[in-house]
Amino acid sequence: MQMMKKRILLCLLVGMTCLPVLAQFRVEVSGVGLTQLPIAVSAFRGQDSVPQKIAAIVQADLERSGQFRGVDTVGAALDEGTRPDVALWRQKGADSLVTGSVSRLADGRYDVRFRLWDVVRGQDLGGQSYAVTQADLRLSAHRIADFIYEKLTGDKGAFSTRITYVTKAAQRYQLWVADADGENAQSALASPEPIISPAWSPNGSQIAYVSFESRKPVVYTHDVATGKRRLIANFRGSNSAPAWSPDGRTLAVTLSRDGGSQLYAIDAGGGEPRRLAQNSSIDTEPVYAPDGKNIYFVSDRGGAPQIYRMPVTGGGAERVTFTGTYNISPAISPDGRWLAYISRVSGAFKLHVLELASGAVTAITDTTADESPSFAPNSRLIVYATQSQGREALMTATVDGKVKARLAGQNGDIREPGWGPFQKQ
């Protein structure tokens, strides 16, 4: 129990120390998946005259997914209206080819067009066009990557979704909303006191978080569109670890109002909380199962922190993690198949993934200070924070751990990542 308290204190306070904020990230992909589709993304005709290199963003998205391997296009610029020499691209080792163009419209917006080709069969697999502002050029590239990913893998792409993370610079904490690749970050809120545990609402319109501005942890929700916030939990003692129910109507929170850290459910608009379990152990870090029937959480009721599951109505809990003696920070994949968590192994904190149906556990990383895992909405990637080369960094990994991408800046550290849901287009 004492070790768990020390770990929670470390997560809440010491772990928030960061270097200056990152303005941009550099994507570094490492590892090789078992099956990677070779794809060539040619330079879009006209892209040299616009602020964003559309083709480069598309290729980086696809490679970061672990499902694709980029084929060198040697500077070829092909527009979507020209049928490519498919035999040539087969010789280059590509199975698929992306061509496109970008041009300025009379109203100042940009016309972005693309087409996807199966060069093995010589088939046109379709394309789309977008009329976007300069600010949305990157978004158009992410949407192109989404189209390609879904067309070639059958799974929905998550490149046009968003993530959150927290930074600290000069005694100033900030919660950021960024593209899924870490770029295009916008400050959502700032405080001289720590901000922790950001959690997206199921529709992506709100972010629940914990602020220490009252000199103790208090739970708020932040409206992403308007910037308005609502007080959710400011009861006696600690208020922490908010988690949204799948329907967005309820938040599970950890409160110490009745002594010790216990799990409660509270209306998403605030109100009187309802205690979920009656016991004397420390229960914290709740997360809802995608079907809304169960809550996963961390408890020391067995003597050391492990992950448990119980019905949302409360009552008896069953232990879920059995590999390792110290397991925290549960995250459930949106498809309900995987549980990501942090396990202490020989003093190091490492990301693991448990397949819930089989009980098979996979060690994802070889780093030593992983934290805060969060699944992409298509369940194919995990974003997490870790320490690499002496400082904190944001990483993504495939669920098998074979491909990782480091979103690294020249200066600065980032913490507490969270992956948002699919957005309506």
From Swiss-Prot:
Pfam families: PD40 (PF07676), TolB_N (PF04052). Part of the Tol-Pal system, which plays a role in outer membrane invagination during cell division and is important for maintaining outer membrane integrity. The keyword Cell division applies. InterPro entries: 6-blade_b-propeller_TolB-like (IPR011042), PD40 (IPR011659), Tol-Pal_TolB (IPR014167), TolB_N (IPR007195). Belongs to the TolB family. The gene is tolB. Residues 1-23 form the signal peptide. It comes from the Bacteria. This is Tol-Pal system protein TolB. The Tol-Pal system is composed of five core proteins: the inner membrane proteins TolA, TolQ and TolR, the periplasmic protein TolB and the outer membrane protein Pal. They form a network linking the inner and outer membranes and the peptidoglycan layer. Its main location: periplasm. One of its GO terms (cellular component) is periplasmic space. The keyword Cell cycle applies. SUPFAM superfamilies: TolB, N-terminal domain (SSF52964), Tricorn protease N-terminal domain (SSF69304). It is found in: Periplasm.
